[in-house]
Amino acid sequence: DSLANDDSLTDDQKKQVKELQKQLSDAQQQEKQQEENSQKKAEQRDAFSKKMDELESDDLKISSAENQEDELAMTASSFEQWDNLLSEMYDYLATVLNADQYASEEASYKQWVQERDSGAENAAKETEDDTAKQLASYSFKQSYTKTHCYKLLDLMN
């Protein structure tokens, strides 16, 4: 500030000093905003990671199901939870990716859903029993969805 008020400078030089000070101030503000955005992204990524850890912990209980019906119910519930988390992750990505990036992600998501559902159908075909068919289908969907959640988490780096 003292430079801008220095009487030995011409009006033109004072104007240049003020412009440079404004540019510096703007750059500092922009850097601060970027740091805040990076921190928010890291916090959101950590929140997703924590939720995934909780779901993984819950998934460990599936192996202790007393019978196939309980295993089916637990696996179906797990799939729903992973699928909900996946939706939350896509909702978040919609806020941080640019339009082209998100459009690309959205297109790959639609293809991914088709692959997931097709894989689940194929898994179910490999058994005759209705409960076993449903279990195979949900197990495939749960595993495939879980893997996709981890891929999206990596995208958030």
List PLM regions with ranges.
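N-terminal alpha-helical modules
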Residues: 1-157
